[in-house]
UniProtKB/Swiss-Prot annotation:
Regulation of activity: The activity of this enzyme could be controlled by adenylation under conditions of abundant glutamine.
NCBIfam families xrefs: GlnA, PRK09469.1
Binding site for Mg(2+) 2: E132, E213, E220
Assembly information from the UniProt record: Oligomer of 12 subunits arranged in the form of two hexameric ring.
GO molecular function: ATP binding; glutamine synthetase activity; metal ion binding
Reactions performed catalytically: L-glutamate + NH4(+) + ATP = L-glutamine + ADP + phosphate + H(+)
Main location: cytoplasm
Cited SMART domains: Gln-synt_C (SM01230)
Entries under Pfam families matching the protein: Gln-synt_C, Gln-synt_N
Domain GS catalytic: 105-468
Protein name from the UniProt record: Glutamine synthetase
C-alpha cells in the first residue's frame, strides 16, 4: 500500500487515530496513538521520535532518542477500537543515520532477507509458521516474599469432570492428550476460533483452517505462508487478534508454551523454503523430494539448532515443553512425514510446494528473530555445504537408550541455549544481519529471566524438602 493509499484510507474511513506499532526484543508489541489529522505524506519520511530507553534491552537514558518510521505497506484498520483506528507497523531507526537500529527485531528480519538476496542463492524465503495457543476461563498467579502460586481453570480441563456448575456439568470435555480434532461439544472453542479467523482475514491474513489441539483449551489456526518479514508482521496480528477476540468472549488467551503440567505444550512449527525467479529451490530428486540445496539448508539448521533455540524457544518455560513424552521434537534429525523428528519434510501435492518444517520452536518466540535466525542458519548450511547425514525414518520417541544417545538434541534449558548462542554466533553476524552488540544485549536480557526463575523459591521445593 502506498502512502497516497494510506492517506485515502484515513479519509474514506473517517479514521480518528493512527496507531504506530513496533515489536520489542522480547517479542511484545508496543504502540503510540496519534490523531489522524497529524498524519500527512511528510510523516512517512520523517517518522515519530520516541524514548528508546523505556524499551527493555534497548537504549541507555543518555542516548535515548529513536525514530519510529511507519511502513505504509503494513497499514490495516483495527477492528477492536471504539474510534476508527489505523494500525501501521514501524521500523526503528537511529536518528543520526536514519538506518535500522541494530537491536530492532523488524530491522534484523529485513537485513536477513537483504543478505539472502545479496548472496545470489535465492531472492525469496517463504515462511509458514503454525503457532498454537491456549484459551482458559480463569488464570490467577502471584509471586512475592510470602509465597507464589498459579491457578488455571477451564471448562474443558479434565480436573473439572466432578465440578459443580450453575447450569450443570455437561460432562463433554477432552481427556489428557485427548483433544485433537473432536467435534463440539468436546471442542468448546469452535465459535471463538471462527470469530478469530474472520477478524484475521479482515486484517489481511489468509486463513487455511482451524481446529482444536491435543490439550484442554489448546487451539490452532493455520494461515497461509508469506515472505519472512511480512509473515512475522502477520504473526503479531495473529497474536493481537487471538488475545482480543478471546477477551471479547470472556476467555483469556496465552502463547506461553507449557502452562499445564502433565499435558502437551504449544509449539510453533515453521515451514520454510527458498525460491529464485519464481522457482522453488527446495524441490529436487534427493531424499523426500528435496534438492541438494534443501539438504544443506537442513544441515545448517541442525548444526546451529542449539543457538537458534535462544530465539525459537526464548523462555524458561519453553524447556518444560521440550522434553520426551509430550510430542515435542527434541532430537535433531530430519525425516519425511515422521513427526518425531525435529525437521520434517511434509507430503505436498506438487514439487512447487516442497518445503521443510522446523518443529522445535514455540509461540513465545519473537517471530522476527526466530525466522531470521533459521534463515541465517540455513544459508550457512548452503554456503558451507553442511550435509545433515542420513534421515531418521523410525519413531525417535521409542529408540533404545544407546541409539538415542547418538542423536544430538536441542538445548535442555534457556541458560544452555544462551551459552550456545554466545559460542555460535558467526552465522548470525554474517553480512551484519545480527550485530555482536545485539547478541550480547539479548543474552543479558534473557539471562535476567533465568536468574529470576533460579532465585525464586518454587512450591514444588516445599513438597520435596519442607520436612527434611
Amino acid at each position: 500500500m502506498s502512502v497516497e493509499k494510506v492517506l485515502s484510507l484515513i479519509q474514506e474511513n473517517e479514521v480518528k487515530f493512527v496507531d504506530l506499532r513496533f515489536t520489542d526484543t522480547k517479542g511484545k508489541e508496543q504502540h503510540i496513538s496519534i490523531p489522524a489529522h497529524q498524519i500527512d505524506a511528510d510523516f512517512f519520511e520523517e517518522g515519530k521520535m520516541f524514548d528508546g530507553s523505556s524499551v527493555a534491552g534497548w537504549k541507555g537514558i543518555n542516548e535515548s532518542d529513536m525514530v519510529m518510521m511507519p511502513d505504509a505497506s503494513s497499514a490495516v484498520l483495527d477492528p477492536f477500537t471504539e474510534d476508527a483506528t489505523l494500525n501501521i507497523r514501524c521500523d526503528i531507526l537511529e536518528p543520526a543515520t536514519m538506518q535500522g537500529y541494530d537491536r530492532d527485531p523488524r530491522s534484523i528480519a529485513k537485513r536477513a532477507e537483504d543478505f539472502m538476496r545479496s548472496t545470489g542463492v535465492a531472492d525469496t524465503v517463504l515462511i509458514g509458521p503454525e503457532p498454537e495457543f491456549f484459551l482458559f476461563d480463569d488464570v490467577k498467579f502471584a509471586t512475592d516474599m510470602s509465597g507464589s502460586f498459579f491457578k488455571i481453570d477451564d471448562v474443558e480441563a479434565a480436573w473439572n469432570t466432578g465440578s459443580d456448575y450453575e447450569e450443570g456439568n455437561k460432562g463433554h470435555r477432552p481427556g489428557v492428550k485427548g483433544g485433537y480434532f473432536p467435534v463440539a461439544p468436546v471442542d468448546s472453542s469452535q465459535d471463538i476460533r471462527s470469530a478469530m479467523c474472520l477478524v484475521m482475514e479482515e486484517m489481511g491474513l489468509v486463513v487455511e483452517a482451524h481446529h482444536h489441539e491435543a490439550t484442554a483449551g489448546q487451539n490452532e489456526i493455520a494461515t497461509r505462508f508469506n515472505t519472512l518479514t511480512t509473515k512475522a508482521d502477520e504473526i503479531q496480528i495473529y497474536k493481537y487478534v487471538v488475545h482480543n477476540v478471546a477477551h471479547a468472549f470472556g476467555k483469556t488467551a496465552t502463547f506461553m508454551p507449557k502452562p499445564l503440567v502433565g499435558d502437551n505444550g504449544s509449539g510453533m512449527h515453521v515451514h520454510q523454503s527458498l525460491a529464485k525467479d519464481g522457482v522453488n529451490l527446495f524441490a529436487g530428486d534427493k531424499y523426500g523430494g528435496l534438492s541438494e540445496m534443501a539438504l544443506y539448508y537442513i544441515g545448517g539448521i541442525i548444526k546451529h539448532a542449539r543457538a537458534i533455540n535462544a530465539f525459537a524457544n526464548p523462555s524458561t518455560n519453553s524447556y518444560k515443553r521440550l522434553v520426551p513424552g509430550f510430542e515435542a521434537p527434541v532430537m535433531l534429525a530430519y525425516s519425511a512425514r515422521n513427526r518425531s523428528a525435529s525437521i520434517r519434510i511434509p507430503v505436498v501435492p506438487s514439487p512447487k510446494a516442497r518445503r521443510i518444517e522446523v518443529r522445535f520452536g514455540d509461540p513465545a518466540a519473537n517471530p522476527y528473530l526466530c525466522f531470521a535466525s533459521m534463515l541465517m542458519a540455513g544459508l550457512d548450511g548452503i554456503k558451507n555445504k553442511i550435509h545433515p547425514g542420513e534421515a531418521m525414518d523410525k519413531d525417535l520417541y521409542d529408540l533404545p537408550a544407546e541409539e538415542s544417545a547418538e542423536i544430538p538434541t536441542v538445548a535442555y534449558s534457556l541458560k544452555d541455549a544462551l551459552a550456545e548462542l554466545d559460542a555460535d554466533r558467526e552465522f548470525l553476524t554474517a553480512g551484519g544481519v545480527f550485530s555482536d552488540d545485539f547478541i550480547d544485549s539479548y543474552i543479558e536480557l534473557k539471562s535476567q529471566d533465568v536468574e529470576r526463575v533460579n532465585m525464586t523459591t518454587h512450591p514444588v521445593e516445599f513438597e520435596l524438602y519442607y520436612s527434611v
